[in-house]
Amino acid sequence: MINDMKIKFLEANCGDSIIISFVDDQGKIRNILIDGGTGETYSSKRRKGELYYVIEDICNKGQAIDLLILTHIDNDHIGGILKWFEEDKRFSSIVKNVWFNSGKLIAEYFKQPENP
């Protein structure tokens, strides 16, 4: 039973980026990140974006992103994630699981031709 849940929609310009945090049955805080918005959601030349600060906060608290969900590869959904992966080499130790909606991967899974 989840006792406490927070859902935050990050400032992502025209994109989407959502962080869901909750306390699981064992009292551990879990984090789910859905998409990463545009590249500027993580950082730009002039400033760090909201995604950057959310990730730093999670790391500083000794937590992880238990699940990263990438809904599709449009830049307004994946750009911030790509920027994060380029700039922060800790990502592989922070992200525990990834769900990626890829037509190619789904087609390979079902051994069907990819629908263009």
Predicted ranges, named:
Residues M1-M5, L82-P116:
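Flexible, acidic/histidine-containing loops and adjacent segments that form or flank the divalent-metal
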Residues I2-K61:
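Conserved beta-strand hairpin/beta-sheet module of binuclear metal-dependent hydrolase folds
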Residues C14, I73-G79, L105-A107:
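Active-site environment of divalent metal-dependent phosphoester hydrolases
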Residues I29, R47-V98:
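Active-site metal-binding motif and surrounding structural segment of the metallo-beta-lactamase
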Residues D35-G39, I73, G103:
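Active-site metal-binding loops of divalent metal-dependent hydrolases
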